Amino acid sequence: MTTETFVKDIKPGLKNLNLIFIVLETGRVTKTKDGHEVRTCKVADKTGSINISVWDDVGNLIQPGDIIRLTKGYASVFKGCLTLYTGRGGDLQKIGEFCMVYSEVPNFSEPNPEYNTQQAPNKSVQNNDNSPTAPQATTGPPAASPASENQNGNGLSTQLGPVGGPHPSHTPSHPPSTRITRSQPNHTPSGPPGPSSNPVSNGKETRRSSKR
């Protein structure tokens, strides 16, 4: 025989749950993207109440006051609230109406901060695993980009500046060189007066020799 579980003993992640409960409320129908209809119902036994998610036609058949036996159900946290589901091969069977002792409190489907803290570390770990990679990816390109920009754009402009600077410096250097070339003729008469006197003396000698 299957052992029955009380609402107070339901924990997230439990499977193959067998319960007997009474339906207190039936919620609104919501449709999924696949076209399925989902209804959340509030059920209870003598230990407390909990929400159960029922799909499609079964949800339309359930009415408040029905006493139902759940077989092969499972529990999970949905939006921070503990919720019952019918698993694969699970079944909901109506076994009676109204005559059942139940307690609406405590409501185990109320938001529980413990469930949020259990889910938060997992999300934070995933964020931490992704965050280092993201900053590395962001810091890498910008670090390389400014360097490349400085080398390609600003670097070239700064290099062009000094390169342009030396050209004017070279241009004045060229005029002095031209002045030097001009000064060479000046220097040549001043420098070679000795040799010039020699040709003059040689010329006189030649003239004297010619006169002789």
Curated annotation (Swiss-Prot):
Q: Where in the cell is it found?
A: Nucleus
Which keywords describe this protein according to UniProt? DNA damage, DNA repair, DNA-binding, Nucleus, Phosphoprotein, Ubl conjugation
One GO term under biological process is: DNA damage response
Q: Which residues carry this modification: Phosphothreonine?
A: 117
Q: What is this protein called?
A: SOSS complex subunit B1
Locate the compositionally biased regions of type Polar residues.
Answer: 114-130, 149-160
Q: How does it assemble?
A: Component of the SOSS complex, composed of SOSS-B (SOSS-B1/NABP2 or SOSS-B2/NABP1), SOSS-A/INTS3 and SOSS-C/INIP. SOSS complexes containing SOSS-B1/NABP2 are more abundant than complexes containing SOSS-B2/NABP1. Directly interacts with ATM, SOSS-A/INTS3 and RAD51. Interacts with INTS7.
Amino acid composition bias (Low complexity), ranges on this chain: 131-148, 166-178
Similarity comment: Belongs to the SOSS-B family. SOSS-B1 subfamily.
The record places the DNA-binding region at 22-92
A GO cellular component term found in this entry reads: nucleus
Query: Do you know which InterPro entries this protein is assigned to?
Result: NA-bd_OB-fold, SOSS-B, Ssb-like_OB
Does Manganese appear among the keywords?
no
Purpose of the protein? Component of the SOSS complex, a multiprotein complex that functions downstream of the MRN complex to promote DNA repair and G2/M checkpoint. In the SOSS complex, acts as a sensor of single-stranded DNA that binds to single-stranded DNA, in particular to polypyrimidines. The SOSS complex associates with DNA lesions and influences diverse endpoints in the cellular DNA damage response including cell-cycle checkpoint activation, recombinational repair and maintenance of genomic stability.
Lineage top rank: taxon: Eukaryota
Q: How is it modified after translation?
A: Phosphorylated by ATM in response to DNA damage. Phosphorylation prevents degradation by the proteasome, hence stabilization of the protein and accumulation within cells. Ubiquitinated in a FBXL5-dependent manner, leading to proteasomal degradation.
Molecular function (GO) terms listed?
DNA polymerase binding; G-rich strand telomeric DNA binding; single-stranded DNA binding
According to the UniProt record, where is the region Disordered? 110-212
Q: Which SUPFAM superfamilies match?
A: Nucleic acid-binding proteins (SSF50249)
